[in-house]
Amino acid sequence: MYPSNPRTLDSFWPCRGQPSLPYAPYRPPNWVTRWLTPGEQARYEADCAAGKPNRYGPDDIEYRFNSQGFRCVEFDEIPKDSFVVLSLGDSNAEGYGLPVEHTWPHLLCEKLRPLVASEVCNLNLGLSASSNQHIAIRASRAMQSPELHPNVVFIDWSYSHRILYAYEDGEIMDWPFPTDSDMKSKDPKIKLKRLYYEQLQSEKFDLCNLMANIMLVEAVANLHRIRICHSFIHQSTEKQDWLSRRVDGIVGSRTDVRNARDLVHLGLEHNEWISDLMRDWFKTAGISAKGKAS
């Protein structure tokens, strides 16, 4: 059930006996829109006015969210006996500025269809601006949910500097690096975020925090005998090297044109590449048609 106050600490961490299905606190349930934010539309219109080429028009993308705020099917409509592919990440997984057909979770599922005997169900739990803590929480809840029963999990870990924070008033928020407007803001909450990045955040803490989140989801996955494909594509080369010596994951980098509709997010070509890497991992992971490690 989607909580009435989704961004509060009390709702985010339900009491015993309450539903613990993952939900997207930054997306209204059952929302259908052509623009995720006013900023997305304003940027698009400014780019068009400046004559910048764009493969998408204003009506080419529809964001359609389920009752838990995710860009996928309703959880109670997962086809029986289907092969459930759970995908998680930030805006690159959710598909900011992209039609759903161009997101990497959708492309991946299309590439997995010839490799499994049953129908493939795409559960995309990507959420823009997610910290890795938030991704790990969603992944763990999904793997423990009998309603979702994923067969395999693909996690495209987010930028490691992001962190999930709870304010004293109980509001929760994923913090990315401060924007230019954040640096000028006098809002006490924004000033607190700025203070964290100016005085506390460090590369070593980011790496330690990411590794702790990886261990969390691996523990849950091992308990339920589910294989996880970790993608470290968004980490620096140094972090990829450190992580790959400790975790079986996808590494690599390439320069892709940021050609989503906002001309900021990565587009179809990047998602074809990462979904190819994930498909290749799946081929060698020893996963049966029922999703358990063989």
Predicted feature locations:
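N-terminal secretory targeting modules
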Residues: M1-L86, L148-N151, D156-K204, E218, ...
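Serine-esterase "nucleophile elbow" of acetyl-processing enzymes
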Residues: R64-S128, N132-Q133, S140
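Surface-exposed cleft-lining segments at the edges of enzyme active sites
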Residues: N92-Y96, L125-S128, K193-M211, A260-L263
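Short catalytic/ligand-binding loop motif for oxyanion handling, primarily in non-cytosolic enzymes
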Residues: E94-G97, S131-Q133, S160-A166, C229, ...
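Soluble or luminal CAZymes and related metallo-dependent hydrolases
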Residues: L127-I135, S202-L216, L266-I274
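Short, well-structured alpha-helical segments in soluble
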Residues: A136-H149
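Conserved, well-ordered alpha-helix/loop/beta-strand core segments that scaffold catalytic motifs
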Residues: I155-D156, C208-R254
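Histidine-centered active-site loop/cap adjacent to the catalytic His
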Residues: D256-S294
